[in-house]
Structure formats: C-alpha cells, structure tokens
C-alpha cells in the first residue's frame, strides 16, 4: 500500500512540529520527487552511499535527521542524485531535537535524567535535570558504552547529581 510523501510529512510534523526548528535550520520536505511511497529509509545524514542504498532497496523516501540542503547546490550534490533517482527527502533536525519525546528527551531517558523537573535550554536543543547520584568516572564509562562516544576528560570521583545534554 503506497502513501504520499505529504502523508508521511504530516505524521512527522505531528511528532516534531516545524515551528520547533531553529531559524537557521532547513527542516521539512527538501526534495519532493512526486512518487508514491512504498519504501522509506531512515538515516542520520543523506550521503551518496545512502542514496545508493535507497535505490538498491526500492525506497522512494529518505527521512534524515540532518538537512541535506544548507547551501546553494551544484549538479554533483546529493539533492541532485535524489531527484535523478526519483527519491524524496524529509529532514527532521532541531525540531526533532526539541520535540517532546524527541532526541533530547530520549537522551535524557538513556542518561537517567529525571523527567520531573527536567528543563529545556538552548532554544530547545538541550535539557537539564537531576539524576541518581553517580561519579564522573562512572558516567563517562556509561556514556562511552551506551552512546559509543569517546571521553575527553575525567576527574573521576566528583559526585554528579545534575546533568545537562545537547543532542546536536
């Protein structure tokens, strides 16, 4: 059963309204190839390899977190590859970061930041709140293992009871 790009966009906007995006962010429908959608590929970034994967898997739509268009385009750029292959693209960036239940709230849940009293900052792109007491060292190890992130500095035994995170 095919659906339209506009139907999918409507659903995504209900989850992460475009009004939540920062002024500079280019979110929403960035390429509309006009094709009915039977297959959707989701990704962090749209690259030439992702476009090839969409073609190989007969996907008519790619939904990405990071916008595929920020600057003037040239024929070799990914948006042209999307159009040439009849693939539409929807990007949900800072609006999905800021949306209730979006990227920042998900990170808070992973990090154990309490939902009660959780506050938004940085125009919705960050959250701050309390957490169960831990040490910087234990938190760094947890983040490295859970989020597959590197650790830059650890002063191991300082207590942590409040965390702030920014998804971008």
Predicted regions and their residues:
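Hydrophobic structural segments
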Residues: 1-168
């Amino acid at each position: 059963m095919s659906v339209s790009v506009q139907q999918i966009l409507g659903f995504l906007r209900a989850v992460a309204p475009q009004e939540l995006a920062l002024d500079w962010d280019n979110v929403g429908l960035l390429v509309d190839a006009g094709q009915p959608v039977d297959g959707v590929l989701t990704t962090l970034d749209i690259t030439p390899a992702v476009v090839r994967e969409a073609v190989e898997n007969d996907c008519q739509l790619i939904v990405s977190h990071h916008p595929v268009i920020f600057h003037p385009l040239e024929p070799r750029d990914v948006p042209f590859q999307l159009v040439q292959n009849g693939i539409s693209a929807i990007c949900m960036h800072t609006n999905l970061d800021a949306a209730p239940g979006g990227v920042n709230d998900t990170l808070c849940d992973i990090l154990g930041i309490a939902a009660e009293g959780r506050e938004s900052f940085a125009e919705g792109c960050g959250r701050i709140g309390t957490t169960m007491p831990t040490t910087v060292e234990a938190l760094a190890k947890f983040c490295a293992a859970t989020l597959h992130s590197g650790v830059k500095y650890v002063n191991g035994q300082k207590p942590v009871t409040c965390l702030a995170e920014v998804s971008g």
